[in-house]
Amino acid sequence: MCSVLAIALVVALLGDMHPGVKSSTTSAVTSPSNTTVTSTTSISTSNNVSSAVTTTVQTSTSSASTSVIATTQKEGHLYTVNCEASYSYDQVSLNATCKVILLNNTKNPDILSVTCYARTDCKGPFTQVGYLSAFPSNDKGKLHLSYNATAQELLISGLRPQETTEYTCSFFSWGRHHNATWDLFTYPIYAVYGTRLNATTMRVRVLLQEHEHCLLNGSSLYHPNSTVHLHQGDQLIPPWNISNVTYNGQRLREFVFYLNGTYTVVRLHVQIAGRSFTTTYVFIKSDPLFEDRLLAYGVLAFLVFMVIILLYVTYMLARRRDWSYKRLEEPVEEKKHPVPYFKQW
């Protein structure tokens, strides 16, 4: 007991002799984000003996991007989309078909959604005109979209726009996003007329009118490189004759084709100075020029027939009259009768 009291007395004396001695307690904490914090603890005693406060904070922060890979993501299929526009001859309804063509395998791509946009100028924003999704959606646009999974075709229908319009459709599938752009030129195609010349040959006249639009970059229909082709199967048929005509007071460009067989619909491909129109299905109407000519030929044939009949009747009457005059002019020969014979008795 005496020894313990002696030790305590020695410690107290040493504290009074060295009041500037400092005692520090250091603790190091490592945070989960690699941040090291070093701090000291300050202790005050009733004898005014204080431990020096020494605080050192060392922070080491490391930043790294976090990448999350979904293990359920499917491999995207490589494919392209080709769109063709068509409209009825009366130019009221619009129909378009976008064909999905696979490049890397024979499986059909899983199209999740398709959104179509349109604009009438080349610099303005696109406006959504149609939407189709594999999930239920209430978004209705100006165009009706339906997808044929068997044929891998997107079918688009609606009212034909009143002016040339640029369309683009965005196809979203697993891991892929593809845009398909196509144009619908409304005004250049004035009319398409067809005439059946015989059982194996058909004459088609395509009438186009001048059209100015920003998509044409200032080009003209009368440019030497501007032309029209018709599709007959896999063949592109060039025009047989190109000329300028005036129809109903309008200046038009006429392209004449001769096709083998009889058609009610033709695939039209127009190119104006390097800018190609979307291939368009155009319904053929009977050629009014041919109908007018046919009517004129019919009337002319009828008149010729009537003239021939009249000439024939006139000839017959004249011949008969001439025969009558000849009968009158001929001298009448008296018939010599034999001398009466009387029998002698």
Swiss-Prot record:
Residues 91-190 form the Ig-like V-type domain. Keywords: Glycoprotein, Host-virus interaction, Immunoglobulin domain, Membrane, Modulation of host immunity by viral IgG Fc receptor-like protein, Signal, Transmembrane, Transmembrane helix, Viral immunoevasion, Virion. Residues 1-23 form the signal peptide. The keyword Transmembrane helix applies. Residues 315-345 are intravirion. One of its GO terms (cellular component) is membrane. It is a single-pass type I membrane protein. The keyword Signal applies. The chain crosses the membrane at residues 294-314. Glycans are attached at residues 34, 48, 95, 104, 148, 179, 198, 217, 225, 241, 244, 260. Residues 23-43 are annotated as: Disordered. Residues 24-293 are virion surface. It is found in: Virion membrane. Serves as a receptor for the Fc part of human IgG. May thus be involved in interfering with host Ig-mediated immune responses. This is Viral Fc-gamma receptor-like protein UL119. It comes from Human cytomegalovirus (strain Merlin).
